[in-house]
From Swiss-Prot:
Gene: mnhA1
Annotated family: Belongs to the CPA3 antiporters (TC 2.A.63) subunit A family.
Record NCBIfam families: 2a6301s01 (TIGR00940), PRK12645.1 (NF009285)
Annotated protein name in UniProt: Na(+)/H(+) antiporter subunit A1
GO molecular function, one term: antiporter activity
GO cellular component, one term: plasma membrane
Length: 801
């Protein structure tokens, strides 16, 4: 196993160990045991920077099911390294922050188990080369995030937010699964790199458009893009460390990673360019507009996150244009990839810090309601400093890193509007307009975020707690991120050669070696647009109290949340009615539906899939076998038309004993003896229960009732026979029976093959089966004891009365 595999598996292993440590070390905060895990992974990833800088990649394989083309393949290039550093680096700071945020009285064992589970899943997503493995980790991120969001499960809002996120992201996961299967059909491979190398085969496939749509749905749901963004604001009910980790730096960026990774395959389609770009721009505008009217600090950051993700998504869409040009022209549009990567890093720094500061304010005052907050400037000066740095970066104000990436974003929108491709040169003028409008609202909510908390009147009577500055443990992580905001803004070259260029080359597959970011490029359209953004933003802030009321009056029916909630109520009701229409309290009717569907499915498959039945090696049928089969069929037929319960029991036993005799003729005395014992016990139990069984009513005597039973029984029997013959005649693997014949005596020192298989080769299976029987027996015994106890208590009450 390689170090890369260990890096992915390490958090998963610790996720199993941490709950055990929690039981024995309750005096020490569990976070201190968790903190080394992401730090070690982060340090290991740092050692791989030189590898990706030189244009090399790391490919490691761990065999799993090689015959089916499914191995635990990990592939690390510049893009995978970037995300791995974010996952482990931000993860380290989040764990450190959580030590101060969560008290020892919380269920820390569960929390850190879920957090490490998510960390390992995210690393698996960004490093997997096998799309099936990627999908498994993808769904694991949804599952673990569900557990983290619902961590405070006593809150109804937490349960609601967790369910909504799970439903939407799992829907996207199923779409992703469909997409990757359609990708694998033309290439006959599950390797992402192989698919990229054979992208032309996929593009010529009839499944290309369908695969592209399904992949985009999977990415859009994960990254909370329009119209799937509604799950993210409700996910803010999670503890603040979860929000800072999942919803700013990791999970919500999994969709961006997927779009970036799949761009070499789908960039040839104008549908990909237009859809990814427009969805990103619409998300940017809509979410930034909604962020301005939020009354909860986390609500502001939630919609802010959605808008910033939309900005990055739009840049990835614009960058796809580079695949349609060569040379320097290609590099012009590939600059959008560079801007997307840079802003992805910047967003993780300032948004992670802002989430942590929000948690600090909530921890200090007991509320996140902007109507109750204000005037905390002198009470929380350190938090104020960190907030100003990171919020101004989010607003795109120099000299912070957010200004550089925002300028790059505006430049890419102007550049894209000039592309003579896919009608972008005519309709592309919308790109900079939407980008500027979205940036104006981004500026507004960023400045208002600072003002809501630290300026205005201090209202101690409305605060659940007396406000105070939080501990150093809660300030250290956001302070580190705020420092990075300044450093990356003043010295972006630290990132360009080591991180941004290799990551961009992984998407564009061309050598990107001239990436530069500057605070001032001259009087460019992007710079002039920035001045317009500042002016309009200040005007909107001054008039904020007037126009924000119009936004807050938005009718509920015009929101996607309204339709989600309505669907969540209507669909279960219709499902219940539909289920009740065919599922009854009469088990016979339920079995008719189940077996009828099985028969229909079997025969549809038989007539639609080519097969052959081979009778070459079938043993000859002897006369006494025919006699036993006739006896067996006669008994089974009589059961269907029996008029008494006793006669049915006798005939059913006759069928079982006839099968036992067949086993004897087939030289399987052990099976025959077992069948004989089972039938004897079953018959005895039936006779013991005979007194309590209801009589066969007139409904059972109806001819239609009996004919239906006969058809279903015969159909199931025929289906099993046909499936058995087809399986016998269409063997794709060598029979395992030869292995048992050769090794039964050598390995197990037994001559009875059946006994040896059951006791030795499949001993654990037999043990568990016996355990299940034992548990079932204990359950029946317990139920009988409880019934007797209740009867005794009832008699005592009657005697007392």
């Amino acid at each position: 196993m390689s170090l890369l595999h260990i890096a992915v598996i390490l958090p998963l292993i610790f996720a199993l160990i941490i709950p055990i440590l929690y039981r024995f070390f309750k005096r020490i905060h569990l976070g201190w045991f968790v903190l080394p895990v992401p730090i070690v992974i982060f340090i290991y990833m740092l050692t791989l920077i030189k590898t990706t800088m030189s244009g090399n990649t790391v490919m490691k394989t761990l065999n799993w099911m090689p015959h089916f083309g499914m191995n635990f393949d990990l592939y690390l290039d510049g893009l995978g390294l970037l995300f791995s550093l974010l996952i482990s680096g931000i993860g380290s700071l989040v764990v450190l922050y959580s030590i101060g945020y969560l008290s020892k009285s919380e269920q820390l064992g569960n929390f850190y188990c879920y957090l490490l589970l998510f960390m390992g899943a995210m690393l698996g997503v960004v490093l997997s080369d096998n799309v099936i493995i990627l999908y498994l980790f993808w769904e694991l991120t949804s599952f673990s995030s569900f557990l983290l969001i619902s961590f405070w499960r006593e809150r109804q809002a937490s349960i609601y937010g967790a369910q909504k996120s799970l439903i939407i992201t799992v829907f996207g996961g199923l779409s992703l699964l469909g997409g990757i299967i359609l990708l694998a059909i033309p290439t006959q491979s599950f390797s992402i790199q192989y698919m990229i190398q054979h992208a032309s085969e996929i593009q010529n496939s009839p499944f290309f458009i369908f695969a592209m749509i399904l992949i985009m749905i999977g990415a859009f749901t994960k990254s909370a893009q329009f119209p799937f963004y509604i799950w993210l604001p409700d996910a803010m009910e999670a503890p603040t460390p979860v929000s800072a980790y999942l919803h700013s730096a990791t999970m919500v960026k999994a969709g961006l990673y997927l779009i970036a990774r799949m761009t070499p395959i789908f960039a040839a389609s104008q549908g990909w360019v237009w859809t990814v770009t427009l969805v990103g721009l619409i998300t940017l505008f809509w979410a930034s507009l909604n962020a301005t009217k939020q009354q909860d600090l986390k609500g502001i950051l939630a919609f802010s996150t959605v808008s910033q993700l939309g900005m990055i998504m739009a840049m990835l869409g614009i960058g796809a244009i580079s695949y349609h040009y060569q040379g320097d022209d290609s590099k012009i549009y590939a600059a959008a990839f560079t801007a997307a990567i840079f802003h992805l890093i910047n967003h993780a720094t300032f948004k992670g810090a802002l989430f942590m500061i929000t948690g600090a304010v909530d921890h200090s005052t007991g509320t996140r309601d902007v109507k109750k907050l204000g005037g905390l400037l002198t009470i929380m000066p350190i938090s104020f400093t960190i907030t100003v740095i990171t919020a101004l970066s989010m607003a795109g104000v120099p000299p912070f890193n957010g200004f550089l990436s925002k300028e790059s974003f505006l430049e890419t929108t102007f550049t894209a509007s000039q592309a003579n491709l896919f009608s972008v040169d005519t309709l592309g003028y919308l790109f900079p307009i939407i980008g500027i409008v979205g940036s104006v609202f981004t500026f507004v909510y960023s400045i208002k975020f600072i003002m809501h908390i630290f300026f205005g009147q201090y209202k101690p009577e409305q605060l659940p707690k007396k406000a105070h500055e939080v501990s150093i443990l809660m300030l250290l992580s956001p302070a580190i991120l705020a420092t990075l905001v300044i450093v990356f803004g003043l010295f972006p070259g630290i990132l360009t050669n080591s991180i941004i260029e290799p990551a961009t080359s992984s998407i564009n597959h061309t050598v990107i070696d001239d990436v530069e970011f500057h605070m001032f490029h001259g009087l460019t359209p992007a710079f002039l647009s920035t001045l317009v953004i500042y002016i309009l933003g200040i005007l909107l802030i001054v008039t904020f109290s007037y126009w924000v009321k119009l936004l807050q009056r938005q009718p509920g029916k015009l929101t996607f949340n309204y339709w989600y909630n309505r669907s969540a109520n209507v669909i279960p009701n219709y499902s219940e009615k539909m289920t009740n229409s065919y599922v009854t309290d009469y088990s016979r009717n339920n079995l008719v539906i189940i077996f009828g569907a099985l028969i229909l499915l079997t025969f549809v498959t038989i007539f639609s899939v080519p097969f052959n039945i081979n009778f070459k090696d079938v043993s000859p049928i002897r006369i006494f076998e025919v006699c036993i089969v006739i006896l067996l069929l006669s008994a089974a037929f009589l059961i269907l038309f029996a008029k008494s319960r006793l006669f049915s029991i006798i005939m059913l036993s006759a069928v079982g004993y006839a099968v036992s005799v067949l086993f004897i003729f087939f030289k399987a005395p052990d099976l025959a003896l077992t069948q004989f014992v089972v039938e004897s016990i079953s018959t005895a139990l039936f006779l013991l229960c005979f007194y309590h069984l209801p009589n066969l009513n007139r409904y059972n005597e109806k001819r239609s009732f009996q004919l239906t039973n006969a058809l279903i029984a015969g159909g199931v029997g025929l289906s099993v026979i046909i499936i058995g013959l087809i399986a016998y005649g269409n063997r794709h693997f060598e029979s395992i029976s030869k292995f048992y014949q050769e090794h039964v005596y050598d390995l197990a020192h037994g001559k009875n093959m059946v006994n040896v298989i059951l006791v030795d080769f499949r001993g654990m299976d037999t043990l568990f089966e016996s355990s299940v029987l034992g548990i079932a027996g204990l359950a029946v015994y317990t139920m009988i004891k409880l019934r007797k106890k209740r009867q005794t208590q009832g008699n005592e009450v009657k005697n007392h009365e």
